[in-house]
Amino acid sequence: MITLDRLNRKEAIRYLGGAGISLNYRMDVLMDECEKEILKTAEPRFLYVERKAPFDDILLGNDIKKHLEGCHTAVMMCATIGSEIDKLIRISQISDMARAVVLDSFASVAVEQVCQKVDEILAEKYSGKYMTFRFSPGYGDYPIEMQKEYLRILDAPRKIGLTTGDSCLLVPSKSCLLYTSDAADEE
């Protein structure tokens, strides 16, 4: 189980387009309130599945082929902070758009921090192996439509409530689906 105790405020400010600026008192208070709301509301969940080579069923596009070239095992992973976050942001969009934007930035930080914690879990599990960077459907020439297949393989709709619609966007929106790393032998 993953828990989030604090969120990276500098990263949230960067998502807001304010990297390197000083916040005024009102914005500082709003940031504090929104961080607390996200931490209280977030329900971090994740799944991963190991896939052994060959990866023919997921190799649509040249970029993913290059990414997994030489790999013996790859890890398909998804993470979410839950649907209540989407509701919280939508409600704020009606009454206080500034708050909604700050909530959205902290929610993005939260799902990224969940992914980083999963990366740490996998790095420990695959100690002594070379781990590549994350690669998601929609990167380069890798079709975003692959998200539906990923969700099916992971059984994510049933296990953690992560789905996609016809547009292939993830629901809840503050979620991530990717080949997080491979476990090729250390070189």
What are these regions (language model features)?
Residues Y179-E187:
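Single conserved hydrophobic/aromatic residue that forms the stacking wall/gate
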Residues Y130-R152:
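Short, structured protein-protein interaction patches enriched in aromatics and acidic/basic residues
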Residues M1-R99:
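Active-site helix-to-loop segments that bind/position phosphate- or nucleotide-bearing substrates
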